[in-house]
Amino acid sequence: MRDHGPMLSAYASSLSPEDPLSALTIGERPEPEPPDGWSKVRVRAASLNHHDLWSLRGVGLRAEQLPMILGCDAAGIDEQGREVIVHAIIGDPDWRGDETLDPRRSLLSERHQGTFAEHVVVPRRNLIQKPPQLSFEQAACLPTAWLTAYRMLFVRGHVTPGETVLVQGSSGGVATALIMLAHAAGARVWVTGRDPKKRERALALGAEQTFEPGARLPERVDAVMETVGAATWAHSVR
């Protein structure tokens, strides 16, 4: 991997609501230099999120911000040689409290260049020591999807062992994390999904039962984790 000069990146060079992949370019971009209080990370692994497709469609990204390197999540090696996970939310340095309420917060690749590159720069406070038992690839999948799932289950949902959790949607990063985290916490996990193979995979991840979308459930659940949207809202609140 090069130490200086242009770096290989995947970036939005245009915006296309109808054909987002046509707006994606793989090529060289200038290697970033960290401002004061920030650190450069040599990216060893980065993970995809649906956010990246939305960016290519122009959701949360304007033409005057282009080219924008995509990617919210990564794991790599910082300037001190530490193995780190990159936290994706860039907040106001003066904000105190729940960062999801910070009106000036953004995700990497919205205002600041993202992680789909050989290097990324972020505030030092955004770097978390990577657990040694996790590979770089595993660690890179954690920040956006798994933090979202954790917050849904335990911060907002207050799920406790023995409760029944319904996860609407059997695929996707957040749904996968919801199933595995809820199962690990001792909850009984039910999952809905259209695709039989994805429902089967949900069982392998820890779900106790799976159902067709909208199916009548054997009993009421304690918490519903909604990852689909309007198509399942009526079923979620029934």
Feature locations, PLM:
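Flexible cofactor-recognition loop at the NAD(P)H-binding site
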Residues: 48, 172, 230
